Amino acid sequence: MASSTIYNIFFRRNSSFYATIFVSAFFAKIGFDVFTDSVWKRANAGLTWDEVKPRFLNKDEDAEDDE
């Protein structure tokens, strides 16, 4: 019963089938990007520019104060 409903909604017409494929691919890409970004951030914690930038800026300000 549920399979016939899914078939009639998503796969019966060619246009519905292609729309289902494109929408699924779009959301799968978003999910994959979010997953890989979280893995990358966890693997490189403390090494990204956003986290290291304040240390470099503080060193530059300290060097200017010494002059």
Curated annotation (Swiss-Prot):
It is a single-pass membrane protein. It comes from the Eukaryota. GO terms for biological process: mitochondrial electron transport, ubiquinol to cytochrome c. The chain crosses the membrane at residues 18-43. One of its GO terms (cellular component) is mitochondrial inner membrane. Residues 44-67 are mitochondrial intermembrane. It is found in: Mitochondrion; Mitochondrion inner membrane. Gene3D superfamilies: Cytochrome b-c1 complex subunit 9. Pfam families: UCR_UQCRX_QCR9. Component of the ubiquinol-cytochrome c oxidoreductase, a multisubunit transmembrane complex that is part of the mitochondrial electron transport chain which drives oxidative phosphorylation. Belongs to the UQCR10/QCR9 family. Component of the ubiquinol-cytochrome c oxidoreductase (cytochrome b-c1 complex, complex III, CIII), a multisubunit enzyme composed of 3 respiratory subunits cytochrome b, cytochrome c1 and Rieske protein, 2 core protein subunits, and additional low-molecular weight protein subunits. The complex exists as an obligatory dimer and forms supercomplexes (SCs) in the inner mitochondrial membrane with cytochrome c oxidase (complex IV, CIV). This is Cytochrome b-c1 complex subunit 9. It comes from Schizosaccharomyces pombe (strain 972 / ATCC 24843). The gene is qcr9.
